[in-house]
Each structure stands twice: as C-alpha cells, then as structure tokens.
Amino acid sequence: MSLTLAIYGKGGIGKSTTSSNLSAALALKGAKVLQIGCDPKHDSTFALTGMLQPTVIDVLTEVDFHHEEVSVEDVVHTGFAGVDTLESGGPPAGSGCGGYVVGETVKLLHEFGLYDKYDVIVFDVLGDVVCGGFSAPLNYADYGVIIACNDFDSIFAANRLCLAIKQKSARYRVELAGIIANRVDYELGGGTTLLEQFAETVGTQIIGRVPYHDLIRRSRLMGKTLFEMEGPGKEECTTPFLEMAEYLLNRPRSTVPKPMGDREIFNVIGGWR
C-alpha cells in the first residue's frame, strides 16, 4: 500500500519547490514516487520535469470526460530520478470546485490501476485553502505535512491547517507527520524559534529545516531540482531533503494536532521570542 502525503502551507511559502525536492529525495532513496499537483496554476511539477504539463482536467475536457479515451501517457509524465508527475489542474477562476478535480484525478488513477503501483504518492496542494474542496487530498492521505517559515502569517496559516487535519482525522486515517521549516535564516529570520514553540503547543514536531539559500531560488527559475544544481551550498540544501525522505519512508510518529483558536494564537504568538 502506498505511503500518501498531503503537503500544505501558506500561499507562496515554497510548497511546490519543497514537494518536488522531497519527491526527488524519496526517489533517490529507492522509492517509486508519484507527485500530484493540485493547483489550477499546474506548476507543481515544473522543477521535476522542466515544463508545464497538460492537466487531468484539460485532457478530460478534450474527450468530454470519457475516461476510457484517456491513456496513462496523456496525464502522467516522468521527471528527474524517475518521479512520475501529474497535474490535476482545476476549474476556471471563480467557478467549480477543486475537490471535484482531485476526486476525478484519484478516480482516473484507480481506473489505470496506478494508485497502488507507487511506494509514495505526494499531493502538493494549493495555498492555505482549507475549504472542503482543496482539503480533499487529506481524505486519501496517511499523513499531512505543513510547510511554514518563522513568521506570524505562516504560523497562523499552519494553525488553520492543523484544524483541518484534526477535523479530517475524525473520519479518515490522516494524521499530522510534522512541519517542514522553510527559508530558515538564523541571522535575520530568527531561525526556527517561533516554529518550535508553535509545534510544541499544537503537539507536533519539526521534521526538517530547509535553509534560505539562493541556490533554491535559482533551481526554481531553471526548472530543476536541487540535486541537479551545481554551486556553493548544494550539500547544505539537499541534505535536509534526504533526511526527511528517510524519516518519512520509515512511517514517522504522527499525531492529531491540537490547534489554537484564532483569537488565542493572536494573543499567544506575541509573547514568543
């Protein structure tokens, strides 16, 4: 049975870059990996494939949603380290439901007999939206993973995501594996001090620390994973992903988080340093 991860975080926090490098690290550890982008921008897998690929919804629309006319090759593309990638896409802006799109994607994977072919499936999910639509990947996941950095807005979004995972855990098997600290800067950004206090408060842990480094920015622009890049800082940037991959493949300790109320987090976080 596949290990299924649903990765969330505040919009612009670096989910797609982080997800792609985590998928690459999992593959380099020997896992057969599928990354599913759940965002109408369909750029989740750009770093793995170097291209913007057609979405499931684009392909289904062309055949009037006749699934039997769609082949695996139409929607699944192989990227770096043999990671298979798929972009679910989404409805046009201002219409439709993202949850329906995710459901159609999973349905198609089952029809192809692919869902159980992989050791790991990674859902990279749009922004910090926790509506019934874009929280749908939690229905299929073993673990939720939250990406955050050491600032208020990011932690506020992480707290809301903890609430979504807690609510979903009442009906589904999903629990929170932990938080990936992104853009960690010990000189100007306070390192992970706020994130560590938040993790302890909601009953979870930091499972990886990704540095704030220009190599990561450049890799995203070039449509490459960090493992394909050259230059100063490569080992510093890739090591956290390899360590996280090893940790997740060993089925980590997980919890049902205990989120704070919105007013509570406003009051509490001001006292953290």
Swiss-Prot record:
Transmembrane segments: none annotated. This is Light-independent protochlorophyllide reductase iron-sulfur ATP-binding protein. The gene is bchL. ATP binds at residues 12-17, 41, 182-183. It comes from the Bacteria. Pathway: Porphyrin-containing compound metabolism; bacteriochlorophyll biosynthesis (light-independent). HAMAP family: ChlL_BchL. It catalyses: chlorophyllide a + oxidized 2[4Fe-4S]-[ferredoxin] + 2 ADP + 2 phosphate = protochlorophyllide a + reduced 2[4Fe-4S]-[ferredoxin] + 2 ATP + 2 H2O. Its EC number is 1.3.7.7. Keywords: 4Fe-4S, ATP-binding, Bacteriochlorophyll biosynthesis, Chlorophyll biosynthesis, Iron, Iron-sulfur, Magnesium, Metal-binding, Nucleotide-binding, Oxidoreductase, Photosynthesis. Signal peptide: none annotated. InterPro entries: NifH/chlL_CS (IPR030655), NifH/frxC (IPR000392), P-loop_NTPase (IPR027417), Protochlorophyllide_ATP-bd (IPR005971).
